[in-house]
Amino acid sequence: MPSFDVVSEVNKVEVRNALDQANKEVSTRYDFKGSDARIEFNDKEVTLFADTEFQLDQVNDILVNKLSKRSVDVRSLDYGKLEKVSGNKVKKVLKIKEGLDSDLAKKIVKLLKDSKMKVQASIQGEAVRVSGAKRDVLQEAIALLKAEIASDLENGAPLQFNNFRD
């Protein structure tokens, strides 16, 4: 029985490359000369540092631009609050969202059931397994999910479809 998994993952290597490029651009730009603007990264979050809120917004724009060029979906970033750190400096923590949260997984299952397609969807941890009788039906399900969930810019999520098996 053919099946595939719906997941929401971020390619950490591409994120690291985009952050390196953004840091290089921030360090060489004239308007950041003498400032402490930088970007730090650990596995689950990205931290932006700058002297002023305006500079922080510019660093964020550079980061978003570099992530987009490396084809990392910026909807996977969860923006935290602006925090003041020592002196007049500011920072912002961006959490990297990975995996489907339970609300989105339930929404995907409900959407597939309401569509009257001949597929079964089951939640398996942070992924949704979709199985059906024919490959064509599964491809229609992928098209439906791309149209309804992945294209929703406001509260959509970056979806990937992997483990497609016959």
Curated annotation (Swiss-Prot):
InterPro entries assigned to the protein according to its UniProt record, in alphabetical order: DUF520, UPF0234-like_C, UPF0234_N, YajQ-like_sf
This protein's UniProt keywords: Nucleotide-binding
Pfam families: DUF520
Taxonomic superkingdom: Bacteria
GO CC annotation: cytosol
Molecular function terms, GO-annotated: nucleotide binding
Region forming the signal peptide: none
Function comment: Nucleotide-binding protein.
UniProt family annotation: Belongs to the YajQ family.
HAMAP family: YajQ
Name listed for the protein in its UniProt record: Nucleotide-binding protein CV_2047
Record lineage: Bacteria, Pseudomonadati, Pseudomonadota, Betaproteobacteria, Neisseriales
